[in-house]
Regions:
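An acidic/histidine-cluster motif and surrounding catalytic segment
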Residues: 1-101, 111-135
Length: 135
């Protein structure tokens, strides 16, 4: 099963234009041949910070975290910290909505196996982000 996307919202959180964000995630899944269901959770800074500490040992807020599960028909989860996205959007010369788009693509690419820890990987991932965002 390819490209099944579920957008979920922690209490008090929301995302503008959810159908467009879901469609964008499906485009990445199709382009990268990702199989299975993906849950994208729009959540608080506190939720992302707790998961970042638990799974990465980093006690700080980040914008997006991806967890690949690869079990049955479930590809993984993406957690997007809404407040962090709003704060950092101006740094990237983005609107809040466009920053969410960037984070959806970024999280999806991580689920597809892409990373940005090394210079070459970072360049490839950025090029793919740009490709899907221009789509």
């Amino acid at each position: 099963m390819a490209g099944q996307i579920a957008l979920l919202y922690e209490e008090g959180q929301k995302a503008p234009r959810p159908l467009e964000l879901s469609k964008l995630a499906k485009t990445v899944a199709k382009g990268e041949k990702l199989q299975g269901r993906v849950e994208i959770v729009f959540c608080s800074d506190e939720t992302v910070r707790a998961r970042n500490k638990e799974y990465r040992g980093l006690d700080k807020v980040t914008d997006v975290l991806s967890f690949g599960w690869e079990e049955d028909d479930f590809a993984g989860e993406i957690f997007i910290a809404n407040p962090q996205a709003k704060r950092q959007a101006p740094r990237w010369n983005n609107t809040y909505y466009n920053e969410l788009r960037r984070l959806v693509v970024h999280g999806m690419l991580h689920l597809c196996g892409h990373d940005h820890m090394k210079v070459g990987e970072r360049k490839t991932m950025r090029e793919k982000e740009d490709l899907y965002l221009k789509g």
